[in-house]
Amino acid sequence: MDLELSGKVAVVTAASKGIGLSIVKALVAEGAHVVAGARSIASLAGMERVTPLAVDLGSAEGPALLVAKAIEQHGRVDVLVNNMGGVRLRLGGFLGTSDEEFAWALQMNFFSALRATRAAVTQMLTQGGGAIVNVASVNAFFQPDGGTVDYGAAKAALVNLTKSLSQEFGPRGIRINDVSPGPVSTDLWLGEDGVAQTVGKAMGIDADAARAKVIASIGGFATGRFTTPEEVATLVVMLASPRTANVTGSNYVIDGGLIKTL
């Protein structure tokens, strides 16, 4: 299927590894030009039809600078993918999570997307429309314990923003949707200081045992495995495509059947 993305201009945040890098590769494979932002851009060097920009997307100015780069380079922004985010496991639960830690979670998972969206929407309105895909999380509506209380609250705010903006800007040609992954085989879960290792240290077990224990405690996957970054990217690119031109304000879960409720 032709996703009709050839020649389109896409901006991707947190694009240098994991889900973000997979999204960049998937967009390029569909013929899009990608302006890709991250703190470190070594992994993006030399990629065809990719303009990397080293930028702090957690800063007040960073997201708008990335969008401005796309406008400078290509004169338009057809697609924005807000992939910026981060989680730090809060072993002390709600009472052990400070205002500063909540502020960090909101900065990483909500305000970065808000700022990039504001800049992109301003441009999209001048050109007659565009598509925005926010990478949220199942933690926006699924909290097995207090360990991700700040992260979940920030992602819930992002999902709410998506719904609100879809109503405001849908009549003006801008579509906005969410993709909410469950656990994905990236460094966030499996890397150094990732969720599995952090839980394992607290429990006195290794990271593999901790990963199995955490997943079992929340009901396990129907598919029996983590989602891959490439699978998330496929869903993101589909929602960015003009082929899904009447899809907006929706939240698509990709979690291997982790969530059991309707």
Spans of features found by a protein language model:
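Short C-terminal tail/terminal secondary-structure segment
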Residues: 91, 225, 236-237, 248-262
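Substrate-binding pocket helix/loop in short-chain dehydrogenase/reductase
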Residues: 90-94, 98-103, 132, 217
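Conserved glycine-rich cofactor-binding loop
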Residues: 9, 16-17
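Catalytic loop of short-chain dehydrogenase/reductase
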Residues: 87, 133-157, 162-171, 183-184
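A short, exposed helix-loop element centered on a Lys and neighboring polar residues
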Residues: 117-118, 163
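Alpha-helical segment proximal to the catalytic Tyr-Lys
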Residues: 122, 167-168, 245
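Short, small/polar-rich loop/turn modules that mediate ligand/substrate recognition or access, typified
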Residues: 170, 175, 247-249
